[in-house]
Amino acid sequence: MRELVRTNDIVLVSAIGALLDGANIHHLVLDQNMSIIEGSLGILPRRILVHDEDNTEARQILADAGLSHELRPDE
């Protein structure tokens, strides 16, 4: 799995999820339930991951949507 985005913006997480769902790219959102522990302060970022084989396509979809500035460095 490769990390695409790390953000505290839950609306952005939802939008990216919708873009990836629309392209039939399976993704995983990590740390989305950590707000229960942190008290909903938004301190801990949510991370969006995709399978290695979907990484290039997912990055292109986000870039096409104008979200390239949100992408994590591709390692």
Language-model regions, residue ranges each:
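Acidic/polar low-complexity segments and flexible, solvent-exposed patches
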Residues: M1-E75
